[in-house]
Structure formats: C-alpha cells, structure tokens
Amino acid sequence: MEVERSKKDDDLNNGSKSNEEEEISVERIFEESNEIPPPWQKQLTFRALIVSFILAILFTFVVMKLNLTTGIIPSLNISAGLLGFFFVKSWTKILNKAGFLKQPFTRQENTVIQTCVVASSGIAFSGGFGSYLFGMSDVVAKQSAEANTPLNIKNPHLGWMIGFLFVVSFLGLFSVVPLRKIMIVDFKLTYPSGTATAHLINSFHTPQGAKLAKKQVRALGKFFSFSFLWGFFQWFFATGDGCGFANFPTFGLKAYENKFYFDFSATYVGVGMICPYLINVSLLIGAILSWGVMWPLIGAQKGKWYAADLSSTSLHGLQGYRVFIAIAMILGDGLYNFIKVLGRTVFGLYKQFKNKDVLPINDHTSTAPVTISYDDKRRTELFLKDRIPSWFAVTGYVVLAIVSIITVPHIFHQLKWYHILIMYIIAPVLAFCNAYGCGLTDWSLASTYGKLAIFTIGAWAGASNGGVLAGLAACGVMMNIVSTASDLMQDFKTGYMTLASPRSMFLSQAIGTAMGCVISPCVFWLFYKAFPDFGQPGTAYPAPYALVYRNMSILGVEGFSALPKHCLMLCYIFFAAAVIVNGIRDALGPKWARFIPLPMAMAIPFYLGGYFTIDMCLGSLILFIWRKLNKPKADAYSSAVASGLICGEGIWTLPSSILALAGVKAPICMKFLSMASNNKVDAFLNPS
C-alpha cells in the first residue's frame, strides 16, 4: 500500500484525458439514448447496497491478505466497477425476463456501488491492520527489546477495534465536503484515478462498452477460478512451516536462504500485471541490493558489529539493519514527496487565487472568452443541483470530533483528550492539502501524515506515559481523516463525470465506511485467530509494516540509542539517498525518470526479501509479452485477468482460515532439502 497508494497504474493515468480533448460529447450520447439521471434517492438502491456488501467482503479479504503479506496493494477501482456492473446487470436481466423490473441499471447506480465498495475495503488499509493497529500488539512488541512494557501494548479485540474505527473514520468525510465545488468545478482538479474510473463506468453503459464489459467479466471469472483452485491445490502440500509450493527453492538453496525464489503466488503475479513496470523493477533492484549484497556483507561482521548469540529476529542484530534502513528510505521518500506535493499545492493555490477570473467569487469578468464544453455545462449543472449544506458538514465534523475526543482516550488511555483536540483542529487543513495534492498528482500522502503524528504525539506523550502506543493511536486518528477526505474527493470527481448526485456519493461513501468498520475488523480477527504464528517474520502472514510502524514510534519516543553499531550512519546515508534519487528523477523529467528506480519501492524488500518481487516481475513480463503480441487485446483484458488472479487466491484465504480454526491441517508436507540434509534424514529414518 505504501507504494501503490502513491504510484498509480500508468495505464490508468494515461487514460485520464480531459473532456475538452474528447471529439464526441459523452453526455449527448447518453441523452440520445433517452437516459435521464434519476433523483439521488433512486441512485441509492437496495440492490446496489446488497451488491456493494457482497463485493466489500470479497475485496476486504483481498486487501487484508495483501496488507498482511507485503503491504503492496494495487488500485481495485476497476475491479469494483466491473464486478458491480456484472452483478447488477445480471440481476436486472433476470428481473426483466420475469417481468418484475422496476428500475433499469444506470451508470449513477454503478458509481454508487464502486464508491461504496472502495470505501469499505479502504478501511482494511487505513484501519492499520497491517501497520499501526497490529503494531500495538504483544506479538509485534516481542520482536523488539524496547518499549515492550504493558503500558505500550494493546492486543487486538473485536470490540475496541470496531468502536475505534467508528469514532475516527467519518470525520474525513465531513472535513472537505464544503470544498467540493471549489475543488471540482472552480479549480477543475483532474483526480486522475477518479476520472479514469468515470470513463470506465461511462463506457460500460454504451452498447459497445457493455459487450466489452461482458467479455472482461468472463476473463476475470476464468482467472478467478484458476487462482482459487490453485490456492486450494497448494494447501494440500503445506501442512507446516517451510512446506509447500510457496517454499520452492527455484534458484537453488543458497538463493532460497537469501529470500530469492518463486513462491507460485497467483496473487502477486496479478499485482505485478497491474503495477507499472518501474515499480516492479525497483522492487527487484531493492531486493538484489539488500539481500544479494548488503545483508551478506553485514552478516559477515557478526560478532564485531553486533553480538553473535542474538536470535535472527532481534533488532539488535542483522534484523535491526534490515528494519531501520528500510524505515530510513521510507521516511526519506515520504518527506521529499510531502514537501514536493505541499509545494505544488501552495503554488497551485497561489496561481488559482492570483488568476481570479476562474473563481466565482470575483465580480469582474474576464475579457477573454472562456469556452465551456457541453459536457462540463451539463455536469456542473447537476453537480451543483443537489447541494450538501455547509452547516451540515461543519456540524457533523464538530459533533463527531467531540464524540471522538471523549471516546478514544477510553480506548487508549495513553492518548489524552488534548492530543486528539489538537489533531482535530489542524486535521481539516491537512485533509484539504492531501485532497488538493491528490487532485493534482493522484498522490495520497495519508501514510506520511500518519507518520508525522507518530513522531509528534509520541514525543509529546513521552516514554514514561506510553508514548509508543500514543503515537500509534495518533497515527490511526490522523490517517483515517486525511485518507477518507482524499478518497471522497476522488469519488466526487467520478460522480461529477457520471452525473451521480453528490448526496448519493456522500451517503454511499458513508455507508461503505460503516460497512468497512465492521467487515475489516472481523476479517482481520479471522486471520488473527486462525493462524497461530500470525505476525511472525518468515511466516505466511508476517504483517511487515506493523513492526516498521512500531519501531518508528519507538524512535520518536526513545531516540537512536537502541540501534546496532553503524546502523545510524547507514540510515543517514539511505535517507539522503532516497531524497537525492527522488530529486534526480524530478530534475530529469518524465522521459528519463522512468529509468530511475523508486526509493519507496526499493525499501520494501529490504525487510521482506525478494520472493514476492519475482512474482511481480513475472506478472510484468507476461503483460510485456502480451502487449508485444496483441496490444489492443492486452490493454482491454489485462486488468480483468490480473483482478481475477488477485481475487481468486485472496478469497481462498476465507476457507483456509475456517479450516485452520477447525483444526484441519493439510495431509502432506512438501519440503526441499540439500543432499547432505537428505542423507541425514534417510539415515535417521532407515538406520542400518
């Protein structure tokens, strides 16, 4: 998620073209087919909410699995829109044949479904189940020698997780509602992902688009079935740790020891097909640099740089270098992009207010005529028709803030009411900055704002007052506000271009958020209870960012004294390198920047290893060859095929979790041994 929330699919963005460039008016096409947008109450249909709920569960399992394995989560907007179209279209077709169809399926209803599903599954990310929230647990605390006292530990429980999410997840929705007209109509911000999703939904509801959508759904279904059955087949051979296809030493046992192998994950092959080539190559370069060069060299200093008798998971040993150097690169990349996007935001606002002709508050008219397309006129007219009153947004924010200020300190005693009050005072400004920056660059910095809260609130609370837990809880409060704010504005852009009412979009986002506040904790709880080694390094679900976030909080509270020898110097070097590499990328421009790796992507395998990068690079290779052989077909179907691969294996986690809870284990352990180890096993089993 750290990568994919920031770096969107290049193909998705390339499809985000402004309506001024369109030769044919989209809205005239729909008017010729006698489509009249229904009132906002009829856009929020019962069938739309039922389909949204089903898809929300599906996508939450997918996002949760990705969150707890590597933390890399691709955009699922296309999948949500496509499956929403398929389910409701099938529903209406059956009812129409039976003579019970009361309302046709519209693009506005399709937009409502997509918004609700993405809002719900988004809680699996912003809820921190793979980062700050699970980082509070004793499972993660035991992996660090510092701050693992009861004051800095809070184990997951369904009750407080659901309650916490309900009191912090809705404020972001109210914080930017009054600014929707300024952002969408006056500033005409692009919101590339929202625009691309709108183009997709509009295309579904044309005759040619409907035919293509059916073929895409068919392709998605085929690869969903393959991925699900492949996950089921693999389960039979993985009865214990180190068993199964996921531990196949593809490049030899030495490479396997250094985390270089193909683990036969259909999910990450699909993720690789969606992620841009540059991200996948950056991940591979990071894996080679760390596990191929750095860690073997630092490991050779065992007994000199760190004690030789430390366990492999001790942060005072080699694991400390892996975790803290990765943190340094993530912080360097995050700080650079925070300053860059903030600078663009301030400069963009300066230009907007300097050129007052674009603002409706100006009484003077421009001498130069401004050409407004028919589509823009029609969309603006309907977008401004169903207003959401500013008093409603302000009242909602204040009431929810008061409830949160009272409630959250009862959940986290270390986080005081005045900490939350200060965050809620500055949060609307940060939410606006994030929403505006996202509109310009498609770049959400929600996790960066969360890290700022970790350091500031954690240091303010202090080590003796549970500052580590306070920092992690503050991260959750801040992340949920700024993340939902930018998501809502993206959805407003989608609604603007599909003629969906802002009221139906707001309510859909709110309903989806409420669904996510229940579904995500329940799905996480299933993982947490089903797998005894959950959260441990080297297991099926290591939750890598949980340890990263906890150690960020420890650094903010206790400083650098706990780092192993020379680790701080290496952290400084890689922090600076991340800033410099980003600076070089921006200085060279897009033409050459595509050949320079992304520091954020390089940092992820520093801690995890290179096994998932092999899967993702294979996905890129498949897409590259497919495009060479048949580019139009690849562009039309690659997202559907990738989504099928991701969702199929993701959904297999539900039955596998239920089997684990029931105590049912796989019958076979398939392991790979060296010749020497195999001879020892044979001698033990067959003594002569």
UniProtKB/Swiss-Prot annotation:
Top-level taxon of origin: Eukaryota
Query: Molecular function (GO) terms listed?
Result: oligopeptide transmembrane transporter activity
Where in the cell? Membrane
What are the Basic and acidic residues biased-composition ranges? 1-11
Per UniProt, the keywords (alphabetical) are: Membrane, Transmembrane, Transmembrane helix, Transport
Q: Which GO terms describe its cellular component?
A: membrane
Coiled-coil parts of chain: none
Task: Spell out the InterPro entries in the cross-references.
Answer: OPT, YSL-like
**Annotated region described as Disordered, given as residue ranges:** 1-26
What's the protein's topology in the membrane? Multi-pass membrane protein
Q: What residues form the membrane-spanning segments? A: 48-68, 71-91, 116-136, 158-178, 219-239, 278-298, 323-343, 392-412, 420-440, 452-472, 506-526, 560-580, 606-626, 644-664
Cysteine pairings via disulfide bonds: none
Pfam (any one): OPT
> What's this protein's family per the entry?
Belongs to the YSL (TC 2.A.67.2) family.
Q: What does this protein do?
A: May be involved in the transport of nicotianamine-chelated metals.
What's the name of the protein? Probable metal-nicotianamine transporter YSL7
